[in-house]
Amino acid sequence: MDSQKNTNLALQALEVLAQYHNISINPEEIKHKFDIDGHGLNQTKWLLAAKSLGLKVRTANKTVDRLPFLHLPALAWRDDGEHFILLKIDQETDRYLIFDLIQKNPIVLDKNEFEERYQSKVILIASRASIVGNLAKFDFTWFIPAVIKYRKIFIETLIVSIFLQIFALITPLFFQVVMDKVLVHRGFSTLNVITVALAIVVLFEIILGGLRTYVFAHSTSRIDVELGARLFRHLLALPISYFEARRVGDTVARVRELDQIRNFLTGQALTSILDLLFSFIFFAVMWYYSPKLTLVVLGSLPCYVIWSVFISPILRRRLDDKFARNADNQSFLVESVTAINTIKAMAISPQMTNIWDKQLASYVAVSFKVTVLATIGQQGIQLIQKAVMVINLWLGAHLVISGDLSIGQLIAFNMLAGQIISPVIRLAQIWQDFQQVGISVTRLGDVLNSPTENNTASVSLPEIQGEISFRNIKFRYKPDSPMILNNINLDISQGEVIGIVGRSGSGKSTLTKLIQRFYIPEQGQVLIDGHDLALADPNWLRRQVGVVLQDNVLLNRSIRENIALTNPGMPMEKVIAAAKLAGAHDFISELREGYNTVVGEQGAGLSGGQRQRIAIARALVNNPRILIFDEATSALDYESENIIMHNMHKICQNRTVLIIAHRLSTVKNADRIIVMDKGEIIEQGKHQELLKDEKGLYSYLHQLQVN
């Protein structure tokens, strides 16, 4: 391979890795800065170039066996310049997914094939944003700052716990005095004093116990609110790709795992831990009474731990299975309710019921196994507790008979042992709940640890004018999927009306998604007014871009609120003006409550054409500089479509408009028509110009529609 090609591979690797980390890159600028002599990017220059983009990089020499422990993707550097990117390693099958920079495609290699390519040199890459994200990773450590934040409340709880433990220590001593002194000497006056004192202790114990529970619940509720608020904010900030890669029910199931964490935080787990911390005081008093009996109690503690450790892995696997089945049920339920019209129309309720019954039976079976295993765990703990009680009774009775221990001391000892064993038993049982919470934290982590589409490099730019440029765009939704857009180069002038046509799956809608920055291209740049959208704030961009889709979702609010969704305080005059422009004002005025009519869930109270016109009004009300119609009129009746087309000149005035349509009549008056096929632009021009090429795709589509 010649040096020029080697240079290109190193630069291509930097491009791919930068795009992976959502970092904009200009290859020509990199060559200008770091390839001054024209000999290409060697390892040193490559590292400097990567650091200039904000990437954290370091070199390492690693054997093949050590690669699974690295943070991927990473660049495998070769002396001959045939570098490649290591994407993923499947340790079970010894398969290696790499991105071949020569073929420009991901390929899978077995271990022998990989070892032939790999030369033990690897460059580890991470973006600064991802490093910050990892530091803030959601797991059990997330709760530590929250505890520190409310440390005053927790310190107060700790103080209350100390007093509770003192009271718990005093009570057995009272019983010892009664048994050994009062009963023997018939000291009624002493009995009265002890009874009053014990009643006061019990009263304070109840009050302080309730106060501790209240304070703890109050503080954990604050943590719960913070976690819930953070979860929803993060969920809305996730990129479209996150939701497209997951079922709705699966996402809902993960969010509902917050309930498990809430129940755990507000339960007895944390108070039991506090009680256990003071156990050493009880052990000291118990040792004073009887070292032999104390050793029996101490010997039981490892038994609780061993039993819990034995049960936990099995329980965790069952809980994982239970969550997966529950997620399947959630997904199927959401899908069924969403598609209820189709289910009714096709009379497939029996088939759907059959599927639901099978899934439900599977879930119930798994839940039953979890319950059985949890019961076995709890009964095992009870068995250990009863065994300790029997041994202590037998040994204690021997000690009393031999005169080494009084009856009062035996009773007091058993009460103190109960104070130690009780939190241990609770914790052993709570350990099973902890397994469920651990899974819940992991599931929630899938949401909270996923990177949002905003990044630290995002900047708000001046008001959009409307000039759009696509430069050498290549894009696909998944690394192992075919290219959706390939070598797209397109310049759209400010105020130009562009029609985009082509067969289904040709990449028309994907092109507009890049304009909305739903995705970052694998290669190339999308520019608006000369600004790279990879560096732009998505919210700044989308506030100035109006979009009307084929299937628009209306919220369960009034028509006015749906139109003025982005600005609830918008003057009514602007709402009405947008509705008139969209041809919606007349039918809205005929409704009994006019603009205050609640449309129902997803606009169920309106016809398809009415929903579409409200969606168009919603897109127009903010006076966007860029307007995208993605099959926006395909669902309209001819009368509604005629109203929209009649107003199209006003709608397009002083705006850059992109109209995606299958009906060519919708775009024939556009300033320019773009014809796409298989992810490429194959024709462009005005309607009449394109018809002159009788062998062209546009002419072919036009002929089909005419006939």
UniProtKB/Swiss-Prot annotation:
Its main location: membrane. The keyword Acetylation does not apply. Gene3D superfamilies: ABC transporter type 1, transmembrane domain, Cysteine proteinases, P-loop containing nucleotide triphosphate hydrolases. ATP binds at G502, R503, S504, G505, S506, G507, K508, S509. Residues 158-436 form the ABC transmembrane type-1 domain. The active site is at H83. GO terms for cellular component: plasma membrane; type I protein secretion system complex. Keywords: ATP-binding, Cell inner membrane, Cell membrane, Membrane, Nucleotide-binding, Translocase, Transmembrane, Transmembrane helix, Transport. InterPro entries: AAA+_ATPase (IPR003593), ABC1_TM_dom (IPR011527), ABC1_TM_sf (IPR036640), ABC_transporter-like_ATP-bd (IPR003439), ABC_transporter-like_CS (IPR017871), ATPase_T1SS_HlyB (IPR010132), P-loop_NTPase (IPR027417), Peptidase_C39 (IPR005074). GO terms for biological process: protein secretion by the type I secretion system; proteolysis. Induction: Levels of toxin expression vary greatly among strains. Highly leukotoxic strains (JP2-type strains) produce more LtxA protein and ltx mRNA than minimally leukotoxic strains (652-type strains). Variations are probably due to different types of promoters. Probably part of a complex composed of LtxB, LtxD and TdeA, which forms a single transport channel across the two membranes. Involved in the export of the LtxA leukotoxin. This is Leukotoxin export ATP-binding protein LtxB.
